[in-house]
């Protein structure tokens, strides 16, 4: 497990280092360290989840546990004090066994040296056709499938957190 101490100040370079640290922990599937990168009042959103607080750490725990074959490449950028990341996980989707290469862009906001807001954006149709096959290809652009996937993801997270 990587050791982690919150950074001393809120300078952008420290924020960039925190995000590099977050994704390096993800590469190691070190969900406990990842959770420590987030403020207790943090907010996270992507195409499948809208989470806050401890739910974020639980999501990373679930994804690390289920993503046994996951590999990850990432880059972190800083422009005008704004920190963004581009990351590309490759993994077998646990529900279908299908290979997924997702391309994600992330934006971050910080409070007290930790992530307070994390927004991930990716092309849901591209993801759904890889993860789900024909149903994703045909319906991945519709709100119907997007909502179904989000509901299923949240149900899985709630069950995971109850363990």
Which sequence ranges carry the predicted segments?
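A beta-strand edge to alpha-helix "cap/lid" segment located at domain peripheries
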Residues: 2-3, 64, 78-163
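Short, low-complexity N-terminal intrinsically disordered segments enriched in polar/charged residues
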Residues: 1-30, 36, 154-163
């Amino acid at each position: 497990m990587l050791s982690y101490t919150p950074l001393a100040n809120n300078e952008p370079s420290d924020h960039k280092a925190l995000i590099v640290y977050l994704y390096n922990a993800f590469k190691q599937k070190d969900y406990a360290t990842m959770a420590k990168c987030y403020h207790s009042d943090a907010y996270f959103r992507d195409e499948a989840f809208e989470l806050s607080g401890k739910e974020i750490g639980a999501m990373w725990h679930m994804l690390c546990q289920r993503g046994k074959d996951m590999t990850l490449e990432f880059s972190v950028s800083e422009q005008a004090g704004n920190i963004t990341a581009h990351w590309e996980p490759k993994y077998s989707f646990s529900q279908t066994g299908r290979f997924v290469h997702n391309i994600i862009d992330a934006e971050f906001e910080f409070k007290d040296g930790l992530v307070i807001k994390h927004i991930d954006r990716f092309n849901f149709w591209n993801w759904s056709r890889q993860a789900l096959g024909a149903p994703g290809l045909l319906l991945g652009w519709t709100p119907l499938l997007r909502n179904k996937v989000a509901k299923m993801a949240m149900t899985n997270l709630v069950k995971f957190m109850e363990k």
